[in-house]
Every structure is written in structure tokens, then in C-alpha cells.
């Protein structure tokens, strides 16, 4: 007798997910999933709820309606934060620490074992030679690159990237796409929000379009 094939559950799945603010709907209900090795590009105009969606998934906002599953199991808020790496509009860096000190501090803060040494991560994002530079001395684009280095050090399988192309030049945009592609090849997944035309999605990319609530 031939045994039936067992397909792995999605890395992340959302069922009837919805969010409201002051009784006004922000998004949803939404049903979507992301498999290992896949990126989901979340598009929509400003006010469509892209940032809010990522914050809900990351556990920064409470799930009001619907369900979030990780590997086929309902995920509690704390479980999601350990499973996901979130890159938001603000880099969340310590302005009076150096770039290298920031990476060491953040790795220790989250109790995570870095998958590469912080110095190597700086080189990957084009900040080699800036190890001792204070964050407050960096440009907006350099701060974004430092935030990308922190992301690269995270062992989290799912990346939540909110407008990762903002404040980056063409080289920076190419860097983001390369990082996403490498993460997917390693078995990770990514949700990427954008409302511009900068994104050149890597392989195995699907689209989710959000519309602003009427």
C-alpha cells in the first residue's frame, strides 16, 4: 500500500484575520499563508493597513479577530515574537552606541545566538569600516543598512519587513533583494510591504493587496 504524501503546513497562516481601531475597520478579514522558501509581497496605498498587519503578526498589537498559526498550530503572542524578526519604519537603534555595539547589544537583549558574527554582518550590508561609528553620526540610509545587519543576524525563520526599500539607494535596494533571496534559499520566509515600484521580488513570490477601508 502506498502511503499518502504529507505536505508540511505553512510556516505562517492567517484565518479571517481582521483589525479595527476606534471601532473603524483597518483591514480584513484576511486569509493568507506563507510557505518556507516563499515571500509574500503585501501591497496597498497608504492607510490600507500594511504596517498594522505586520505589527499584529509580530505580536506588537493584539489579535482582535481571526487566528494566526505557525507550522499548523495556533500561535500565542509570545511564540510569534520568537519566531519572527520585524523590521519597521524606525530602526530601533541606540543612537549613542557604535554600529558594532548596537549589534552585540541587540543579540544579547533577545538572547539569540547570532548566525554570523556582527562584524561580518556589517560587511554584508556595506558598513565595513564603520564598526566604531556612532549611530547618531550615520545617514538615514546607513541606519537602515545597520537595521538590515541586525535582521541578518537573527535566526528567526520569518522576516516581517515594513517598507524595507525606504531611504535606500539602488545599491541598497539590490542588497535587500539579495538578503531576502538568501533567506528564502535557506528555508526562511518573508512578508514584505511596499506601495512603490522598487521591489524586485525574489523567487517564489506571491502578492497580497490591501485596500483602505471605506
Swiss-Prot record:
Q: Indicate the principal place this protein occupies in or around the cell.
A: membrane
E.C. no: 7.6.2.5
Q: Name one GO biological process term.
A: cytochrome complex assembly
Q: Which InterPro entries match?
A: AAA+_ATPase, ABC_transporter-like_ATP-bd, ABC_transporter-like_CS, ABC_transptr_haem_export_CcmA, P-loop_NTPase
Gene Ontology CC, one term? plasma membrane
The membrane-topology field of this record reads: Peripheral membrane protein
Q: Where in the cell is it found?
A: Cell inner membrane
Q: What broad class of enzyme is this?
A: translocase
Annotated ABC transporter domain residues = 12-214
As its record notes, the protein acts as a catalyst of:
heme b(in) + ATP + H2O = heme b(out) + ADP + phosphate + H(+)
Enumerate the residues binding ATP: 44-51
* Keywords from the UniProt entry: ATP-binding, Cell inner membrane, Cell membrane, Cytochrome c-type biogenesis, Membrane, Nucleotide-binding, Translocase, Transport
Question: What's an example of a GO molecular-function annotation for this chain?
Answer: ATP hydrolysis activity
What family is this? Belongs to the ABC transporter superfamily. CcmA exporter (TC 3.A.1.107) family.
Q: What function is annotated for this protein?
A: Part of the ABC transporter complex CcmAB involved in the biogenesis of c-type cytochromes; once thought to export heme, this seems not to be the case, but its exact role is uncertain. Responsible for energy coupling to the transport system.
Mind telling me which PANTHER family this protein's record contains?
ABC TRANSPORTER I FAMILY MEMBER 1
Complex and partners: The complex is composed of two ATP-binding proteins (CcmA) and two transmembrane proteins (CcmB).
Q: What is this protein called?
A: Cytochrome c biogenesis ATP-binding export protein CcmA
Q: Which organism is it from?
A: Xanthomonas oryzae pv. oryzae (strain KACC10331 / KXO85)
Tell me what gene encodes this. Answer: ccmA
Amino acid at each position: 500500500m502506498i502511503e499518502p504524501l504529507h505536505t508540511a503546513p505553512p510556516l505562517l497562516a492567517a484565518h479571517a484575520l481582521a483589525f479595527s481601531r476606534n471601532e473603524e475597520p483597518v483591514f480584513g478579514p484576511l486569509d493568507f499563508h506563507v510557505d518556507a522558501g516563499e515571500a509574500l509581497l503585501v501591497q496597498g496605498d497608504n492607510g490600507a493597513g500594511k504596517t498594522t498587519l505586520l505589527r499584529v503578526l509580530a505580536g506588537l498589537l493584539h489579535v482582535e479577530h481571526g487566528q494566526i498559526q505557525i507550522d499548523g498550530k495556533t500561535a500565542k503572542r509570545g511564540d510569534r515574537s520568537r519566531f519572527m524578526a520585524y523590521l519597521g519604519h524606525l530602526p530601533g537603534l541606540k543612537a549613542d552606541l557604535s554600529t558594532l555595539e548596537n549589534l552585540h547589544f541587540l543579540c544579547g537583549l533577545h538572547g539569540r545566538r547570532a548566525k554570523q558574527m556582527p562584524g561580518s554582518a556589517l560587511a554584508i550590508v556595506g558598513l565595513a569600516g564603520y564598526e566604531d561609528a556612532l549611530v547618531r553620526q550615520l545617514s538615514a540610509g546607513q541606519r537602515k543598512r545597520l537595521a538590515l545587519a541586525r535582521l541578518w543576524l537573527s535566526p528567526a525563520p520569518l522576516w516581517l519587513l515594513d517598507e524595507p526599500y525606504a531611504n535606500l539607494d539602488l545599491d541598497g535596494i539590490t542588497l535587500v533583494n539579495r538578503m531576502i533571496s538568501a533567506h528564502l534559499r535557506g528555508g526562511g520566509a518573508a512578508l514584505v510591504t511596499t506601495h512603490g515600484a522598487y521591489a524586485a521580488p525574489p523567487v517564489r513570490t506571491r502578492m497580497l493587496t490591501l485596500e483602505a477601508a471605506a
